[in-house]
C-alpha cells in the first residue's frame, strides 16, 4: 500500500447521465498509489466485475490510470487486493482491418474515461467507444464503431491477469459463443486453479466468426478451439456501416457452461435486455443499496463517503448461479436453496470492519455470506483463511476466520438453523490442529500454542518450519492474531451464554507471552513484543524496524504490533508501566505534537503508505493491524486525542485516483472509513463494543434492513467538521445521556439514535472518567463480594430511610495507575411482600445500601438484601461478582412504646403476621423518627429474628457484626468511579 497523492479528481460520468447515489460514486478512487482498485462496472456483491485491464503488477494489479491504453475488458476482478488475480474472458474491440488475436495495447483517447457505480465508458483508437455495465452474473457491453465500416470483437480466453491454463471456445451459432478458461494463483499462496465458464450472446448475428489457437493464427469460420495453456480465443466481425453499435452479454459461472447460459438468459430476459436497460437497472440497484445510508454533508464529502461505501459493498462476491448451484471448496457442485452463495473471503482484512458494516447496511447479504462461510467449512473440511473463489490461497497468517465468525455471532447474522454446529466448528477451529487432508492450514501450531501460549517462531531464511509454513515464520504477529481471535470467541460466548466464555477470554491475554520487558527502544522506552522461539526465549536478534524475515511480524514492525492488543487494554497499560507511560508512548507513536501543530495533516513520522511496513516505527494508517490504534486513547481517559488522529487519517481519502491509504483489501479500509465518518468503530471483534469518535457529517441515517420499513439508526452531530478535529462534548444514545466512550451494538441493531454535540474545545471532559474508558475484554476486574446485614429500624406508618446492609469487595483490583475502582451494582431489598431498590453509597471498599420504606404495622420482619453487578455490565463480560444476598432483621416500631416489638411483654397478637422477637442489639439506628412525635423512645440495635406466625419460635438476635454471605468472583469489565448513587424506586412484587 502506498500513500495518497495529490491529483486532479478522477473522472466521473456527467451528472445528467445518471441520477441518484450511484452518480456520486467515483470508481477511479484507489486506482493509483498501489490502491489496486478497478474502475469498471459491477453490481452490489456481483459475480461479474467488468473492467478495463492494462496492468498486472503488484503495484497495479489490473489497472493503472497512468497507462493510457487497455488490453481490453475482462469479467472478473478482485477489489483492491495486493496481488494480481482473475481477469478472465478479455473482450478486445478493434476497428482495424484485422481482428486482435493476442493481448495488445489499445490506445485510449485522453480525457474520455468516465465511470460511476454500475457504469464505465472510454473512447479508444479507431473511433471505438466502449461502454460497460452488468447484472449480478452477466457482463453487458456496448461498442460503437463510429469511424469504420467494420468492427471486430475478440474474446481472448488464453490470457488473464495470471497464467491461464486450459481453455476452450466454441461457436454455438453466429450470435452465441461459449467456453471456459482455467485460471488461478494469488500472491504466491497456491498453484491451484479453477474453471470460469462463459456464455456470450451478441445482439445481432455476426457477419463472420472464427477462432485462433496457441500459435495466434486466426482461422475464419473455425467453429471451436481448445488449448492446454496459452493463447486461445474467438472473433466476431460485424458490418458497422449503418448500425454502428454492437452489444454483447456475457454470462459467467463457476459450475458449467449450462450455468453460464442460464445466468445470461435469466438476467437478460432471454437476451432481450438492451444495454440501456441493463445500465438503468444496475444504477437503480446501486441507488437502493447505497441508500441504506444517507448523510447530510457537502457534495465533496458525499462523493467520498459513497465511493467508500460502494467499495465496502463489492465483496464477498456472488458465487452461485441463478439455479442455486455453486462450486464448493471441495470442488464439487452444491446447491444453495433459498439463499445465495458468496465467495472470496479476505478474512485477515475483513474481520476487523467489513463484517460489522455488512450486518448494519446489507443484512440480507450478510446472513447469506455467513451461511456461505458455514458451507465452506462443511465442504472444505475447515474454515478458510483467504479463499479466492473455490481456491484456498492460505495467504496471510493468524486465525482470522475465528474472529470473523465470532463477530457475526455478535451481530446476529448467523442463521438460527446453523448456529449450534457453526459454534462447534468455531471452537474446534481455534483449539485443534488442522487435519492433513484439508486445503486450509488453520491453526497448524494449535497443540503447541495451547500449551505454551505462543506460536513457535522459526526464521524463514533458516532451516526449519519457517521455510515451509507461514504461521511459524510469522510467529510473532500470528500469536497476536490468535489472542484477539480467542478474545472474540470469548466475548461472543459470553453474549450468547455459551460455556466457553471464561476460557477464551483468558486466552485473549496470551499475547503477554510475547512481552519482553528488557528491550530498549527509541524514545527511551523499554519493553516490546518479541517473537518467541520454541524453547521460550525471545527473538532478541531483531530490532524495532526489522522486516518479517528477522522479526516474525508480518506487515508491520514490533512497534506497530505492540498495540494490537485492543482486547486487553488494562494488560497493555500494565506492561508498559501504567496509564501515564502508556499515553506517553502513544503520543510518541502518533507524533502528537505534530498533529496538534498541523491539525488534519499526517505527520512525517507516520508510515509513508500502507505497504511501507518496516521503515517506520510510527503509526501506519493504512494497514490492518494498526487501523484500530486511534481509539487506544479512549482506554486511558483521553478520548479527545482519538479525533486528532482520525482527522489526519480520514483526510487521506480524497476524491482522487490516489485516494485512500493503499490497498482497500476487499472493502476493509472502506468499511473503516464509513464507520469512522459516522462516529463509531468496532474495535474488538465479537465484543459488540463500538468505540465512539466525532462524526464528520452533520447527520446520517442507516437503514438496518433491506426494506423501506426497516429500522433506522439516526445520527445527529451538531458542530461537526469535514476535515478538522472536533471533540465530543456530549452524546446521547437512544435519548439517554451517555458518558462512556463506547456503546453496545445491540443498543442500535433494532434502530435508535446517536446524538452528538461537538466542540472545538479539546479539553472537553466527556469520556475522561474511569467509568467511561474502553473496557478490557480479556482482563476483567476480579473481586470477591461479601454482604453484611444492617440493623434497620422503621416507625410504622412513617416513611423512613435506613441502612439495610453493605457489600464489601475483597482483593480489589487496581488498574495501572493504582486508582481503586468498584464495579457497578444493582441492589434490591425485599420485606413484607414489597421489593425496594436499594440506594448504594460508596465506602472505602464497597457499598452501603439504604432503603426508604414505610411499614403499616409494628413488629419484627425478616428482609432480604440482594446485590448483583449493575445492569450496565457489558454484555461481552460475565458479571463483576456473583450475586450475594443476606437476611436482614427489620424492626418496625409502633407509635406507642408499648407497640415496640422488642420491649418485654409486648403482645405478639398485636402483630399476628410477625413472630416473637429475639434480643435487641445495641447498634444505632441510621434514621429514626422524632420521639416527641411518636410519644415514645426510639429502639436501637439489631432487631431479633422473626418468630412464627403463631408468635412462637423467634430467632435469637444476630450479632452486631452482621451476617455475611461470600460471593465468588466472575470476570467483569466495566468500572465506575466511587460515589455513584442509583435512584431508588419502589415496586410491588407480583
Label each PLM-derived region with a short phrase.
Residues 960-986:
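A cross-kingdom C-terminal cell-surface attachment/processing module
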Residues 816-819, 872-883:
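Beta-sandwich strand segments
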Residues 228-232, 843-850:
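Aromatic sugar-binding surface patches on proteins
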Residues 791-802:
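Short, solvent-exposed loop/linker segments at the N-terminal edge
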Residues 2-15:
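Sec-dependent signal peptide cleavage junction
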Residues 891-959:
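C-terminal low-complexity, Ser/Thr- and acidic/Pro-rich disordered "stalk" regions positioned immediately N-terminal
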Residues 13-355, 359-403, 409-468, 472-480, ...:
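Accessory carbohydrate-recognition regions in carbohydrate-active enzymes
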Residues 853-857:
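Residue-level recognition of secondary-structure-to-loop junctions
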Amino acid at each position: 500500500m502506498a500513500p495518497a497523492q495529490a491529483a486532479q479528481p478522477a473522472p466521473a460520468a456527467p451528472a445528467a447521465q445518471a441520477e441518484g447515489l450511484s452518480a456520486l460514486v467515483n470508481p477511479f478512487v484507489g486506482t493509483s498509489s498501489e490502491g489496486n482498485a478497478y474502475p469498471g462496472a459491477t453490481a452490489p456483491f456481483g459475480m461479474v466485475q467488468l473492467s478495463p485491464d492494462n496492468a498486472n503488477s503488484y503495484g497495479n494489479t489490473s489497472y493503472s490510470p497512468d497507462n493510457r491504453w487497455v488490453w481490453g475488458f475482462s469479467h472478473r476482478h478482485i477489489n483492491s487486493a495486493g496481488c494480481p488475480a482473475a481477469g478472465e474472458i478479455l473482450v478486445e474491440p478493434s476497428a482495424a482491418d484485422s481482428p486482435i488475436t493476442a493481448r495488445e495495447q489499445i490506445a485510449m483517447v485522453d480525457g474520455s474515461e468516465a465511470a460511476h457505480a454500475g457504469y464505465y465508458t472510454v473512447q479508444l483508437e479507431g473511433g471505438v467507444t466502449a461502454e460497460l455495465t452488468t447484472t449480478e452474473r452477466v457482463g453487458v457491453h456496448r461498442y460503437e464503431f463510429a469511424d469504420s465500416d467494420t468492427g471486430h470483437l475478440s474474446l481472448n480466453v488464453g490470457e488473464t491477469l495470471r497464467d491461464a491454463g486450459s481453455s476452450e471456445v466454441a461457436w454455438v451459432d453466429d450470435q452465441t459463443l461459449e467456453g471456459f478458461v482455467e485460471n488461478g494463483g494469488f500472491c504466491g499462496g497456491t498453484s491451484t486453479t479453477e474453471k470460469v465458464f462463459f456464455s456470450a450472446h451478441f445482439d445481432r448475428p455476426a457477419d463472420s466468426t472464427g477462432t485462433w489457437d496457441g500459435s495466434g493464427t486466426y482461422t475464419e469460420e473455425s467453429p471451436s478451439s481448445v488449448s492446454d495453456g496459452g493463447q486461445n480465443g474467438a472473433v466476431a466481425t460485424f458490418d458497422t456501416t449503418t448500425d454502428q453499435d454492437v452489444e454483447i452479454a456475457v454470462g459467467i459461472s463457476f459450475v458449467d457452461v449450462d450455468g453460464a447460459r442460464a445466468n445470461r438468459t435469466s438476467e437478460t430476459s432471454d437476451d432481450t435486455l438492451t444495454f440501456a436497460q441493463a445500465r438503468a437497472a444496475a444504477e437503480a440497484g446501486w441507488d437502493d443499496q447505497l441508500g441504506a445510508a444517507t448523510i447530510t454533508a457537502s457534495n465533496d464529502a458525499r462523493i467520498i463517503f459513497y465511493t467508500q461505501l460502494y467499495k465496502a459493498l463489492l465483496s464477498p462476491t456472488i458465487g452461485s448461479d441463478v439455479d442455486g448451484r455453486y462450486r464448493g471448496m471441495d470442488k464439487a457442485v452444491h446447491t444453495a436453496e433459498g439463499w445465495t452463495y458468496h465467495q472470496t473471503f479476505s478474512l485477515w482484512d475483513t474481520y476487523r470492519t467489513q463484517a460489522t458494516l455488512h450486518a448494519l447496511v446489507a443484512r440480507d447479504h450478510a446472513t447469506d455470506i455467513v451461511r456461505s462461510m458455514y458451507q465452506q467449512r462443511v465442504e472444505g473440511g475447515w474454515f478458510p483463511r483467504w479463499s479466492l473463489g473455490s481456491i484456498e490461497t492460505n495467504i496471510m497468517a493468524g486465525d482470522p476466520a475465528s474472529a470473523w465468525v465470532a463477530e457475526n455471532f455478535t451481530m446476529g447474522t448467523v442463521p438460527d438453523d446453523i448456529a449450534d454446529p457453526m459454534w462447534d466448528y468455531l471452537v474446534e477451529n481455534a483449539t485443534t490442529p488442522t487435519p492433513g487432508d484439508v486445503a486450509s492450514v488453520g491453526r497448524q501450531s494449535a497443540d503447541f500454542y495451547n500449551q505454551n501460549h505462543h506460536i513457535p517462531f522459526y526464521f524463514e531464511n533458516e532451516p526449519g518450519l519457517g521455510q515451509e509454513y507461514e504461521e511459524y515464520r510469522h510467529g510473532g504477529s500470528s500469536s497476536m492474531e490468535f489472542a484477539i481471535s480467542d478474545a472474540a470467541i470469548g466475548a461472543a460466548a459470553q453474549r450468547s451464554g455459551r460455556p466457553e466464555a471464561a476460557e477464551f477470554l483468558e486466552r485473549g491475554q496470551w499475547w503477554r507471552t510475547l512481552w519482553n520487558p528488557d528491550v530498549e527502544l527509541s524514545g527511551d522506552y523499554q519493553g516490546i513484543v518479541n517473537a518467541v522461539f520454541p524453547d521460550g526465549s525471545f527473538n532478541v536478534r531483531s530490532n524495532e524496524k526489522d522486516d518479517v524475515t528477522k522479526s516474525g511480524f508480518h506487515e508491520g514492525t514490533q512497534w506497530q504490533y505492540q498495540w494490537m492488543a485492543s482486547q486487553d487494554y488494562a494488560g497493555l497499560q500494565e506492561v508498559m508501566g501504567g496509564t501515564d507511560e502508556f499515553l506517553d508512548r502513544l503520543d510518541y507513536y502518533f507524533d502528537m505534537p505534530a498533529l496538534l501543530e498541523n491539525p488534519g495533516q499526517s505527520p512525517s513520522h507516520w508510515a509513508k503508505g500502507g505497504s511501507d511496513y518496516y521503515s517506520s516505527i510510527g503509526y501506519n494508517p493504512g494497514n490492518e493491524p494498526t487501523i484500530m490504534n486511534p481509539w487506544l486513547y479512549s482506554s486511558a481517559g483521553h478520548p479527545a486525542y482519538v479525533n486528532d488522529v482520525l482527522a489526519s487519517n480520514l483526510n487521506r481519502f480524497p476524491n482522487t485516483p490516489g485516494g485512500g491509504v493503499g490497498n482497500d483489501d476487499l472493502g476493509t479500509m472502506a468499511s473503516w472509513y464509513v464507520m469512522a465518518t459516522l462516529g463509531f468503530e468496532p474495535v474488538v471483534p465479537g465484543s459488540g463494543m463500538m468505540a465512539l469518535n466525532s462524526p464528520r457529517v452533520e447527520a446520517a441515517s442507516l437503514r438496518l434492513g433491506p426494506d423501506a420499513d426497516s429500522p433506522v439508526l439516526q445520527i445527529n452531530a451538531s458542530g461537526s467538521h469535514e476535515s478538522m478535529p472536533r471533540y465530543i462534548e456530549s452524546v446521547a444514545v437512544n435519548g439517554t445521556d451517555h458518558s462512556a466512550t463506547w456503546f453496545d451494538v445491540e443498543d442500535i441493531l433494532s434502530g435508535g439514535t446517536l446524538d452528538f454535540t461537538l466542540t472545538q474545545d479539546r479539553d472537553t471532559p466527556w469520556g475522561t472518567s474511569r467509568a467511561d474508558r474502553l473496557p478490557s475484554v480479556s482482563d476483567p476486574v476480579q473481586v470477591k463480594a461479601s454482604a453484611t446485614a444492617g440493623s434497620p429500624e422503621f416507625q410504622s406508618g412513617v416513611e423512613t430511610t435506613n441502612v439495610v446492609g453493605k457489600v464489601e469487595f475483597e482483593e480489589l483490583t487496581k488498574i495501572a495507575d493504582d486508582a481503586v475502582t468498584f464495579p457497578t451494582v444493582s441492589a434490591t431489598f425485599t420485606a413484607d411482600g414489597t421489593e425496594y431498590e436499594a440506594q448504594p453509597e460508596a465506602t472505602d471498599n464497597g457499598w452501603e445500601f439504604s432503603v426508604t420504606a414505610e411499614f403499616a404495622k409494628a413488629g419484627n420482619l425478616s428482609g432480604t438484601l440482594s446485590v448483583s453487578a449493575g445492569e450496565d455490565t457489558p454484555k461481552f463480560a460475565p458479571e463483576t461478582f456473583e450475586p450475594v444476598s443476606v437476611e436482614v432483621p427489620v424492626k418496625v416500631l409502633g407509635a406507642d412504646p408499648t407497640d415496640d416489638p422488642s420491649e418485654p411483654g409486648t403482645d405478639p397478637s398485636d402483630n399476628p403476621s410477625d413472630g416473637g422477637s429475639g434480643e435487641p442489639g445495641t447498634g444505632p439506628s441510621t434514621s429514626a423518627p422524632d420521639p416527641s412525635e411518636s410519644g415514645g423512645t426510639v429502639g436501637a440495635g439489631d432487631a431479633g429474628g422473626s418468630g412464627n406466625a403463631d408468635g412462637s419460635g423467634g430467632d435469637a438476635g444476630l450479632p452486631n457484626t452482621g451476617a455475611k454471605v461470600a460471593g465468588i468472583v466472575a470476570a467483569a469489565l466495566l468500572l465506575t468511579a466511587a460515589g455513584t448513587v442509583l435512584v431508588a424506586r419502589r415496586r410491588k412484587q407480583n
